[in-house]
Amino acid sequence: MKTLFLLGLIALTAVSVYCEEEEKTEKKETKYGTIIGIDLGTTYSCVGVYKNGRVEIIANDQGNRITPSYVAFSGEQGDRLIGDAAKNQLTINPENTIFDAKRLIGRDYNDKTVQADIKHWPFKVLDKSNKPSVEVKVGADNKQFTPEEVSAMVLVKMKEIAESYLGKEVKHAVVTVPAYFNDAQRQATKDAGTIAGLNVVRIINEPTAAAIAYGLDKKDGERNILVFDLGGGTFDVSMLTIDNGVFEVLATNGDTHLGGEDFDQRVMEYFIKLYKKKSGKDLRKDKRAVQKLRREVEKAKRALSTQHQTKVEIESLFDGEDFSETLTRAKFEELNMDLFRATLKPVQKVLEDSDLKKDDVHEIVLVGGSTRIPKVQQLIKEFFNGKEPSRGINPDEAVAYGAAVQGGVISGEEDTGEIVLLDVNPLTMGIETVGGVMTKLISRNTVIPTKKSQVFSTAADNQPTVTIQVFEGERPMTKDNHQLGKFDLTGIPPAPRGVPQIEVTFEIDVNGILHVTAEDKGTGNKNKITITNDQNRLSPEDIERMINDAEKFAEDDKKVKEKAEARNELESYAYSLKNQIGDKEKLGGKLDEDDKKTIEEAVDEAISWLGSNADASAEELKEQKKELEGKVQPIVSKLYKDGGAGGEEAPEEGSDDKDEL
C-alpha cells in the first residue's frame, strides 16, 4: 500500500515510503551554429571555441588568454572599461571599479559572506530588498548595478573577444559555474548571459569542464579522476570516472567562498597591521592605498610560487611615504595555513560520497591559478600518500577548454560524438513537512537530468489549499537549510484529511536548475514553478530592463569609440600637414608663401580647436576635418595639377592615418 503524506496549509506531514520515477531527458539534436565556452571567473575569465577538431583558447586585444573580471566607469563622461583596462586603473579609481561580482551573484545582501566581503571592497554595496546592488559614479550620476548586470558586462567582453577572433557574431555559449553553486546562483548566472545577449545553452560545473579538458584524449579504460579546483574566489572538488569518452561525476563538494583573494586578504591584513605598528598610521583610511597594496600583494603571491622570498615595494603609498617590506614563502604559508588545510575536508567528503579509498584515485587534476601555490600542492600530495598530481593541463585555461568542448558537442562539431557528460546535483533537494522536517526528494550527487515524484495529502479536513515549501541542503530540519521558494496549490475539493492525493514532482534539468510541480490527482488541478527564489532572482521585467541598459551601454561604448576615431583622424591629418609644410623636400618647398600661410593658419586653428574642445562629439570632429580639408585641398590640387609637387600625391584623407599607440 502506498503511504500518503499529509500536507498542511503551511507545512507538510509524515514520512516514509514514496513512489519514485526517474527519467533522463533525451538529447535533442539542435543546430546552433558556433557555441563558445566561457569560464566566468571571480577574478579572471577565459573564452574558447571548438573548431576544426580542436579547441582554441582565444586571446584578448591585449594578447592575454585570461581577462580580468573587472568593470570600471571613468572620466567625466563615465566611459565604461572592461577587463585589463578596468583593472589597470583600479588604484586611481577604486570607488568606481567593480570586481568579485561572482561573490555576490545569487546571494542575499544579509548573507554573512557578503557582509564580510563588503568591508574589503572599495566600491559601495547597497541593500535592495535584501539583494546586493553595487553603486558607482557614471559620469555625474550615481548608478546601481546588480551582480547579474556586472557579470553580463564581463560576458559581453568575452563574447566580443570571440567575435573578433571568429569574424562573426556569436549568440550561443556554454558557461561554467562552481560545482557547489546553488540553484539561485546558477539561475542568476544564466540571467547574466541573457542580459549580455547570449543564449546560455548549458551551465556546466567547472571541475567537470576541467575533467573534459584533461580526459579528452584518455582512452585507456575506466579511470577515477579527482579534480581539485582552487580559483580566485571559489573552491570545488569533484570525483569523476572517465571511460572511453563517458564522463560521470560521482560526487562533488566545495566552498563557494574560498580562493586566491582570501589568501591575498590575509597578507594585506598582515602588512596593514605591520605598517600601523611602525608608522602609527592606518592604511585603511585611504582606498587608493589599499588597492595599491592589493595589486602588489597579488604580484608577490605569484612570485612566491617560484621564489622563496620577494620584496613588496610601493612608492608613495600613504601620506607620501614609500612602503618596502619582504614577504617570505614561509610567512605567506603561515598566514594562510588554516585556509590551505580547509581544502582537504571537501576532498575527504568526496572520497566518502564516492565510496572510494585514496588508492582508488588514478589521477589528481589541479585546476585554478591558486593550485600553483607550492604548499597547496604539497598538502594534496601528502593527503594522497605521496601521489603526484598530473601537470598536463594549464590550470588557468582548463575550465574554458572543457566548456568549449561541450559547446562543440552540443553544436554537433565533428570528433565530439563520443563525448558523454553525466553531471550531478551538488545539494539534496526536498520539501518541508510538519514540524519543520526536511523531506528529501532528490539526494545530493544524483546524476542529472533527473525527475522524481512523491505523493502527499492534506493535514486537515476540508483543506482547500496546500503550500509547497522547497529547500536545498543536507540538514534534517528545514530551518538549517536554504529555502529556494514556495507556492500554493489551491482549489482542493472538500474531503477528510488524508484523502486527497497530491503528487509533487521535482525535475532537475541539464543546467542543474530545479522545476517543481504539484498536481491534485483527483481533479487534475496543477501548479508548477521553476524555482526562482524571489529573494535572489531577477524578474522577467528586471531582465528586460537590464538587456535594454546593456544595449544602451553598448551604444555608448560605440559612440566613445567613434569619437576617439574621429579625433584621431583630425589630429593625424592636421599634424601630417604641419610636418609636410615644415619639410622643404615635401609641400614646404613647393608652395608659394601665401598658400603656405593659408594652410599653416588652418592647421594651427584646427590644432587649437582640438585643444579647447576635449568633449567634442564625433560629428563636430568630422565637421572640423571637413573644414580643414576644404581649405587645404584646393591649394594642394592646384599644385598637383601644375606638376609642382614633383609627382608627389596630395595628402588626402587618411594619407597618414594610423592607429596611434
Swiss-Prot record:
Composition-biased stretches (Acidic residues): 649-661
Entry superkingdom: Eukaryota
GO CC terms, sorted: cytoplasm; endoplasmic reticulum chaperone complex; endoplasmic reticulum lumen; membrane; nucleus
Cell compartments where the protein resides: Endoplasmic reticulum lumen
Residue ranges of the region described as Disordered: 618-661
Gene3D superfamilies registered for this protein in UniProt: 1.20.1270.10, 3.30.420.40, Actin, Chain A, domain 4 (3.90.640.10), Substrate Binding Domain Of DNAk, Chain A, domain 1 (2.60.34.10)
A molecular-function term among this protein's GO annotations: ATP binding
PTM summary: AMPylated by fic-1.
Signal peptide limits: 1-17
GO terms (BP aspect): chaperone cofactor-dependent protein refolding; endoplasmic reticulum unfolded protein response; ERAD pathway; IRE1-mediated unfolded protein response; protein refolding
Pfam families xref list: HSP70
Biased composition (Basic and acidic residues): 619-630
Keywords associated with the record: ATP-binding, Endoplasmic reticulum, Nucleotide-binding, Signal, Stress response
Motif extent (Prevents secretion from ER): 658-661
InterPro entries for the chain: ATPase_NBD, BIP_NBD, Heat_shock_70_CS, HSP70_C_sf, HSP70_peptide-bd_sf, Hsp_70_fam
Similarity comment: family membership: Belongs to the heat shock protein 70 family.
NCBIfam families linked: PRK00290.1
Function: Probably plays a role in facilitating the assembly of multimeric protein complexes inside the ER.
Protein known as: Heat shock 70 kDa protein C
Species name: Caenorhabditis briggsae
UniProt gene name: hsp-3
